[in-house]
Amino acid sequence: MRAPASSAASNRPGPSNHPTPRWNSKQFFLTYPHCNLTPSELMKELFSRLTEKIPGYIKVSQEFHKDGDPHLHVLIQLNTKLCTRNPKFFDVQGFHPNIQPVRDAEKVFGYISKTNGDSDEMGELQLRIKKPEKPTRDQRMAMIIASSTNRNEYLSMVRKEFPFDWAIRLQQFEYSAAALFTEPPPVYQSPFPNEQIVCPPELVDIIDQEWNQVTTD
């Protein structure tokens, strides 16, 4: 009787399995250590190798270490993704680079632009447009408080900005509106017209007598 196949053997990938690509990106940061090629020579070699991927931008910068040893740094931006498992894809004339996919091209560009040697580039650098950060709920509420000038305006802005909260917390918003925008007390209005307020003659005589009375100590 044949022994059952082990679970390890059954989990081995068959010939139909596709290997995961080693590099799969549109942007690469390469560093060629101990490389005595000029930036122009390296750029031409890379451009010819990447032609079918339609290079959008390539920049090569030379850096000399304190001992005079030259390094070359490269930023590559492609219009289509490069997908390869070939570890020697970027090898040029026997020089093998350190390869890193790029997430932030602006940082890499800034780094290789500060080198102390020659540089060469082709194409137009493409930078990701950063979307402005949305204000938080607290910031939006603070803007409403700062910009509204009365209760009605405040409540109207809250209703527009926070419709769900308005529906379930209306009483709290009305309370905060009353606390933020206190109304001055109403001006007193007499129920009697001024022409109806007449001092009786008898009272006039009494007042005159009291005010005009002279006393001696």
Curated annotation (Swiss-Prot):
> Which E.C. number(s) belong to this protein?
3.1.21.-
Q: Where is this region: Oligomerization?
A: 176-188
Q: Where is the CRESS-DNA virus Rep endonuclease domain?
A: 22-125
Q: Give the matching InterPro entries.
A: CRESS_DNA_REP (IPR049912), Gemini_AL1_CLV (IPR001301), Gemini_AL1_REP (IPR001191), Gemini_AL1_REP_central (IPR022692)
* Gene3D superfamilies, alphabetized: 3.40.1310.20
What GO annotations for molecular function exist for this entry?
DNA binding; endodeoxyribonuclease activity, producing 5'-phosphomonoesters; metal ion binding; nucleotide binding; nucleotidyltransferase activity; structural molecule activity
GO CC, alphabetical: host cell cytoplasm; host cell nucleus
Q: What is this protein called?
A: Replication-associated protein A
The active site consists of: Y111
Q: Where is this motif: RCR-1?
A: 29-32
Q: Residues that bind a divalent metal cation, according to the entry?
A: E63, H71, H73
PROSITE patterns (UniProt xref)? CRESS_DNA_REP
Stretch list, region Disordered: 1-22
